[in-house]
Amino acid sequence: MRHGRRWWLLLGLLGALAMAPRAAEAQEFDLGAGADYWTQSPGMGIFSFGLDALWRVAPGIQLGFKPGFFLTTSGDVPAGIPLDFKVRVNVSSVYVDGFIGPWFFFKGDVARIHVGMGAGLRLGRLLLGGEVSYLNNGATFGGRIGFQL
């Protein structure tokens, strides 16, 4: 084999390796929105927007995180940034999520714990579901809609 051919073979091999999927890359991204009722006195609405980044760790099981942004219907606590770590179990077209993480508020108690679970249906690239969680001094109940990117 001539020296020039070896060079092209090596270059082709490096190109194929560069384009191969890497284990460190997220395998699924979901862009979503939600609306919740928060029972903290006197009760308020929360509208959230987030991007799930998920990695498959076993068949039907994914781990990931969900950064985002939220707005509330209260002037006392107007907005913030949620950062949930999550586990998702997929069974056919049904998914179940468990999550925990800090929510950072722009006013008042800056960091609050968020723990909960959700479930829903995967209809092609569309995800429809619900969620129940605990956020600091009250429960949240709401719906979710998402789109797999």
Say what each PLM segment does:
Residues 139:
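N-terminal glycine-rich cofactor-binding segment
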Residues 6-7, 37, 54, 102:
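Residues in intrinsically disordered, low-complexity segments of regulatory proteins
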Residues 49-132:
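Gram-negative (and chloroplast) outer-membrane scaffold detector with strong preference
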Residues 9-10, 40, 57, 105:
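Intrinsic disorder/low-complexity segments enriched in polar/charged and small flexible residues
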Residues 1-28:
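Cleavable N-terminal export/targeting peptides
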Residues 121-126, 143-149:
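A signal for specific C-terminal beta-sheet/loop modules enriched in small/flexible residues
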Residues 19-73, 87, 142, 146-148:
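Short glycine/proline- and aromatic-enriched beta-strand/turn motifs that initiate or cap beta-hairpins
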